[in-house]
UniProtKB/Swiss-Prot annotation:
It comes from Pectobacterium carotovorum subsp. carotovorum (strain PC1). Belongs to the OMP decarboxylase family. Type 1 subfamily. This is Orotidine 5'-phosphate decarboxylase. Pathway: Pyrimidine metabolism; UMP biosynthesis via de novo pathway; UMP from orotate: step 2/2. Its EC number is 4.1.1.23. Substrate binds at residues 22, 44, 71-80, 131, 192, 201, 221-222. Pfam families: OMPdecase. Catalyzes the decarboxylation of orotidine 5'-monophosphate (OMP) to uridine 5'-monophosphate (UMP). CDD domains: OMP_decarboxylase_like. The keyword Zinc does not apply. GO terms for biological process: 'de novo' pyrimidine nucleobase biosynthetic process; 'de novo' UMP biosynthetic process.
Length: 247
Protein backbone atom coordinates (compact mmCIF):
# COMPACT_ATOMS: atom_id res chain seq x y z
CA UNK A 1 0.00 0.00 0.00
CA UNK A 2 0.99 3.63 -0.31
CA UNK A 3 3.40 5.32 2.03
CA UNK A 4 1.36 6.88 4.86
CA UNK A 5 2.95 10.28 4.26
CA UNK A 6 2.00 10.41 0.57
CA UNK A 7 -1.69 11.17 1.06
CA UNK A 8 -0.89 14.01 3.45
CA UNK A 9 1.55 15.42 0.90
CA UNK A 10 -1.02 15.11 -1.91
CA UNK A 11 -3.29 17.41 0.07
CA UNK A 12 -0.63 20.09 0.65
CA UNK A 13 0.38 20.77 -2.98
CA UNK A 14 -1.86 23.64 -4.05
CA UNK A 15 -0.38 24.23 -7.50
CA UNK A 16 -2.57 23.25 -10.47
CA UNK A 17 0.53 22.80 -12.65
CA UNK A 18 1.61 19.33 -13.77
CA UNK A 19 4.96 19.27 -15.57
CA UNK A 20 5.16 16.69 -18.34
CA UNK A 21 8.53 14.96 -18.23
CA UNK A 22 9.80 13.94 -21.66
CA UNK A 23 13.38 12.70 -21.48
CA UNK A 24 15.23 9.77 -23.04
CA UNK A 25 17.77 9.91 -20.22
CA UNK A 26 16.92 9.35 -16.58
CA UNK A 27 19.92 11.45 -15.60
CA UNK A 28 18.66 14.39 -17.68
CA UNK A 29 15.19 14.04 -16.17
CA UNK A 30 16.49 14.05 -12.62
CA UNK A 31 18.81 16.95 -13.39
CA UNK A 32 15.74 18.95 -14.39
CA UNK A 33 13.66 17.74 -11.45
CA UNK A 34 16.35 18.80 -9.00
CA UNK A 35 16.02 22.39 -10.25
CA UNK A 36 12.34 22.75 -9.31
CA UNK A 37 10.32 22.71 -6.10
CA UNK A 38 7.66 20.02 -5.44
CA UNK A 39 5.45 22.72 -3.92
CA UNK A 40 5.29 24.47 -7.31
CA UNK A 41 4.05 21.55 -9.40
CA UNK A 42 3.38 17.86 -9.80
CA UNK A 43 5.06 15.64 -12.40
CA UNK A 44 3.62 13.55 -15.22
CA UNK A 45 5.33 10.33 -16.28
CA UNK A 46 4.12 8.90 -19.57
CA UNK A 47 4.53 5.71 -21.56
CA UNK A 48 8.02 6.36 -22.91
CA UNK A 49 9.69 7.18 -19.61
CA UNK A 50 7.81 4.51 -17.67
CA UNK A 51 8.83 1.90 -20.26
CA UNK A 52 12.44 3.05 -20.21
CA UNK A 53 12.92 3.48 -16.47
CA UNK A 54 10.12 1.53 -14.78
CA UNK A 55 8.35 1.94 -11.44
CA UNK A 56 11.67 2.72 -9.76
CA UNK A 57 11.76 6.06 -11.57
CA UNK A 58 8.35 6.98 -10.16
CA UNK A 59 9.58 6.08 -6.68
CA UNK A 60 12.68 8.22 -7.19
CA UNK A 61 10.49 11.22 -8.01
CA UNK A 62 8.33 10.54 -4.96
CA UNK A 63 11.42 10.34 -2.77
CA UNK A 64 12.25 13.85 -3.98
CA UNK A 65 8.86 15.00 -2.71
CA UNK A 66 6.84 15.07 -5.95
CA UNK A 67 3.31 13.87 -6.60
CA UNK A 68 3.22 11.78 -9.78
CA UNK A 69 0.54 11.56 -12.43
CA UNK A 70 1.08 8.17 -14.09
CA UNK A 71 -0.10 8.85 -17.62
CA UNK A 72 -0.33 5.37 -19.14
CA UNK A 73 -3.88 5.62 -20.52
CA UNK A 74 -4.86 2.02 -19.75
CA UNK A 75 -7.23 0.56 -22.35
CA UNK A 76 -7.89 -3.18 -22.21
CA UNK A 77 -10.43 -5.69 -20.95
CA UNK A 78 -11.94 -4.69 -17.57
CA UNK A 79 -10.04 -7.23 -15.47
CA UNK A 80 -6.66 -6.26 -16.91
CA UNK A 81 -7.27 -2.55 -16.45
CA UNK A 82 -8.49 -3.10 -12.88
CA UNK A 83 -5.26 -4.90 -11.97
CA UNK A 84 -3.15 -2.24 -13.69
CA UNK A 85 -4.88 0.57 -11.81
CA UNK A 86 -4.45 -1.27 -8.51
CA UNK A 87 -0.75 -1.68 -9.28
CA UNK A 88 -0.50 2.07 -9.86
CA UNK A 89 -2.19 2.68 -6.51
CA UNK A 90 0.28 0.33 -4.84
CA UNK A 91 3.05 2.41 -6.37
CA UNK A 92 1.66 5.45 -4.58
CA UNK A 93 0.88 7.68 -7.54
CA UNK A 94 -1.31 10.76 -7.12
CA UNK A 95 -3.26 10.27 -10.35
CA UNK A 96 -3.70 7.52 -12.96
CA UNK A 97 -5.73 7.42 -16.15
CA UNK A 98 -7.60 5.13 -18.52
CA UNK A 99 -9.18 5.61 -21.97
CA UNK A 100 -12.88 6.45 -21.73
CA UNK A 101 -13.35 4.73 -25.08
CA UNK A 102 -12.70 1.45 -23.24
CA UNK A 103 -16.30 1.72 -22.08
CA UNK A 104 -18.23 1.92 -18.84
CA UNK A 105 -17.60 -1.67 -17.69
CA UNK A 106 -13.87 -1.13 -17.95
CA UNK A 107 -14.01 2.17 -16.06
CA UNK A 108 -16.25 0.80 -13.32
CA UNK A 109 -13.88 -2.14 -12.85
CA UNK A 110 -10.97 0.28 -12.53
CA UNK A 111 -12.80 2.38 -9.94
CA UNK A 112 -13.80 -0.69 -7.94
CA UNK A 113 -10.17 -1.85 -7.90
CA UNK A 114 -9.30 1.29 -5.92
CA UNK A 115 -11.90 0.76 -3.18
CA UNK A 116 -9.47 -1.17 -0.90
CA UNK A 117 -7.12 1.82 -0.92
CA UNK A 118 -9.69 4.11 0.69
CA UNK A 119 -8.47 7.69 1.07
CA UNK A 120 -5.06 6.64 -0.25
CA UNK A 121 -6.46 5.83 -3.69
CA UNK A 122 -5.12 7.97 -6.53
CA UNK A 123 -7.40 10.17 -8.56
CA UNK A 124 -8.78 8.09 -11.43
CA UNK A 125 -9.45 10.00 -14.61
CA UNK A 126 -10.25 9.11 -18.19
CA UNK A 127 -8.94 10.38 -21.51
CA UNK A 128 -11.64 11.71 -23.85
CA UNK A 129 -10.29 13.12 -27.12
CA UNK A 130 -6.54 13.57 -27.45
CA UNK A 131 -5.61 17.24 -27.83
CA UNK A 132 -3.64 16.44 -30.99
CA UNK A 133 -6.84 15.31 -32.74
CA UNK A 134 -9.14 17.48 -34.82
CA UNK A 135 -12.37 16.81 -36.71
CA UNK A 136 -10.55 15.24 -39.66
CA UNK A 137 -8.81 12.78 -37.33
CA UNK A 138 -12.12 11.77 -35.76
CA UNK A 139 -13.74 11.34 -39.15
CA UNK A 140 -10.99 8.89 -40.06
CA UNK A 141 -12.11 6.79 -37.08
CA UNK A 142 -15.72 6.83 -38.22
CA UNK A 143 -16.75 9.46 -35.66
CA UNK A 144 -18.81 12.16 -37.35
CA UNK A 145 -19.22 14.60 -34.47
CA UNK A 146 -16.86 17.41 -33.49
CA UNK A 147 -14.05 16.89 -30.96
CA UNK A 148 -16.06 18.90 -28.43
CA UNK A 149 -19.17 16.74 -28.89
CA UNK A 150 -17.17 13.52 -28.64
CA UNK A 151 -15.35 14.77 -25.55
CA UNK A 152 -18.67 15.59 -23.91
CA UNK A 153 -20.11 12.15 -24.70
CA UNK A 154 -17.07 10.43 -23.19
CA UNK A 155 -16.97 12.79 -20.20
CA UNK A 156 -20.59 12.00 -19.35
CA UNK A 157 -19.83 8.28 -19.67
CA UNK A 158 -16.84 8.74 -17.36
CA UNK A 159 -18.87 10.68 -14.80
CA UNK A 160 -21.64 8.09 -14.84
CA UNK A 161 -19.02 5.38 -14.30
CA UNK A 162 -17.93 7.03 -11.05
CA UNK A 163 -14.49 8.30 -12.03
CA UNK A 164 -12.99 11.51 -10.66
CA UNK A 165 -12.62 13.42 -13.90
CA UNK A 166 -11.29 13.50 -17.44
CA UNK A 167 -8.40 14.66 -19.54
CA UNK A 168 -9.80 17.13 -22.04
CA UNK A 169 -9.03 20.21 -24.08
CA UNK A 170 -9.40 23.49 -22.22
CA UNK A 171 -11.88 24.52 -24.90
CA UNK A 172 -14.31 21.90 -23.55
CA UNK A 173 -13.77 22.73 -19.88
CA UNK A 174 -16.59 25.19 -19.28
CA UNK A 175 -19.17 22.96 -20.94
CA UNK A 176 -17.94 19.82 -19.13
CA UNK A 177 -18.20 21.55 -15.76
CA UNK A 178 -21.80 22.43 -16.59
CA UNK A 179 -22.63 18.87 -17.64
CA UNK A 180 -20.66 16.89 -15.05
CA UNK A 181 -20.54 19.27 -12.08
CA UNK A 182 -17.91 21.45 -10.44
CA UNK A 183 -16.43 18.55 -8.43
CA UNK A 184 -15.57 16.66 -11.63
CA UNK A 185 -11.84 17.19 -12.19
CA UNK A 186 -10.60 18.47 -15.54
CA UNK A 187 -6.98 17.79 -16.52
CA UNK A 188 -5.80 19.64 -19.59
CA UNK A 189 -2.74 19.22 -21.78
CA UNK A 190 -2.03 21.62 -24.61
CA UNK A 191 -1.40 24.49 -22.19
CA UNK A 192 1.21 26.98 -23.38
CA UNK A 193 2.27 30.16 -21.56
CA UNK A 194 1.87 33.28 -23.70
CA UNK A 195 4.61 33.46 -26.32
CA UNK A 196 5.40 29.73 -26.31
CA UNK A 197 5.67 27.52 -29.39
CA UNK A 198 2.43 25.65 -30.14
CA UNK A 199 4.26 22.36 -30.85
CA UNK A 200 2.08 19.35 -31.75
CA UNK A 201 -0.93 20.33 -29.63
CA UNK A 202 -3.56 21.88 -31.87
CA UNK A 203 -6.17 22.99 -29.36
CA UNK A 204 -4.28 25.15 -26.87
CA UNK A 205 -4.82 27.84 -24.24
CA UNK A 206 -2.63 29.86 -21.89
CA UNK A 207 -2.61 28.90 -18.17
CA UNK A 208 -4.77 31.89 -17.22
CA UNK A 209 -7.28 31.14 -19.98
CA UNK A 210 -7.42 27.50 -18.85
CA UNK A 211 -7.96 28.49 -15.23
CA UNK A 212 -10.76 30.86 -16.19
CA UNK A 213 -12.38 28.10 -18.26
CA UNK A 214 -12.57 25.82 -15.22
CA UNK A 215 -9.51 23.58 -15.65
CA UNK A 216 -8.39 21.98 -12.36
CA UNK A 217 -4.95 20.72 -13.42
CA UNK A 218 -2.96 22.01 -16.39
CA UNK A 219 -0.25 19.91 -18.01
CA UNK A 220 2.71 21.93 -19.29
CA UNK A 221 5.82 20.38 -20.83
CA UNK A 222 8.47 22.00 -22.99
CA UNK A 223 7.85 25.63 -21.98
CA UNK A 224 9.05 24.56 -18.52
CA UNK A 225 11.38 21.62 -19.19
CA UNK A 226 13.27 23.52 -21.91
CA UNK A 227 13.40 26.78 -20.00
CA UNK A 228 16.82 28.18 -19.08
CA UNK A 229 15.40 28.72 -15.57
CA UNK A 230 12.50 26.29 -15.02
CA UNK A 231 12.00 27.31 -11.39
CA UNK A 232 11.55 30.93 -12.44
CA UNK A 233 9.22 29.93 -15.28
CA UNK A 234 7.09 27.97 -12.82
CA UNK A 235 6.97 30.93 -10.46
CA UNK A 236 5.95 33.26 -13.28
CA UNK A 237 3.13 30.93 -14.32
CA UNK A 238 1.90 30.64 -10.74
CA UNK A 239 1.97 34.43 -10.32
CA UNK A 240 0.01 34.83 -13.56
CA UNK A 241 -2.57 32.35 -12.25
CA UNK A 242 -2.89 34.18 -8.94
CA UNK A 243 -3.28 37.49 -10.75
CA UNK A 244 -5.78 35.94 -13.15
CA UNK A 245 -7.84 34.55 -10.28
CA UNK A 246 -7.97 37.93 -8.53
CA UNK A 247 -8.77 39.99 -11.62
Amino acid sequence: MKNENLQQKHQTVSSPIVVALDYASQQAALSFVDRIDPQDCRLKVGKEMFTLFGPQFVQTLQQRGFDVFLDLKFHDIPNTVAHAVAAAADLGVWMVNVHASGGSRMMVAAKEALVPFGNDAPLLIAVTVLTSMDEDDLRGLGITVSPAEQAERLAVLTHNSGLDGVVCSAHEAQRLKQVCGQAFKLVTPGIRPAGSDVGDQRRIMTPVQAQQAGVDYMVIGRPITQSADPAQTLREIRVSLLNGASS
